Amino acid sequence: IYKSFMQLGADVVTLGNHAFDNEEIFDFIDHSKKLVRPANFPEATTPGTGLIYLNINQTKLAVINLQGTALMQNLDDPFMVAEELVEQARQHTPNIFMDFHAETTSEKQAMAYFLDGRVSAVVGTHTHVQTNDARVLPGGTAFLTDVGMTGPADSIIGMKKEDVLRRYVTKLPTRFNVQENGPGILSACIIE
């Protein structure tokens, strides 16, 4: 998927809690200059990086990826890691984009206010459903709680509706399968 996005012209791909579910990623993550994994995974044992710098239209941009810990995997404190990485990035550029891959809206909002005025934007990911709360915080940081997913439109968060409904109706464990056919949706946000 990463290689396909690069061929289509993506500037960067950020990851989240499923970053290492597919073993193929270990073959190329350390050599991929535009692939960013959550920086608060254990640094000593996790391949890849959580901070990269890009030059886009003669503008230097830092991209930081962190994963929340509320209702998710217990990782290094994302707020403390954010503090370190933002200070590091600010030595190179004032243009800093943060992808905060987290479950709860409150943790995403807390991160945005924590970094307000120190980063250009905090955009949440993970829940697959775009929120309708794009705004600029008092310190000038652009914020969107969740950008949503890129995937099948006629699905439940990208999975076959029948599988998800079966789990909710029967309360039995059900394997979710990706909805692979039909029209797609591209969720996005534009930040000037």
Tell what function each PLM region has.
Residues I1-E192:
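Acidic, metal/ion-coordinating pockets
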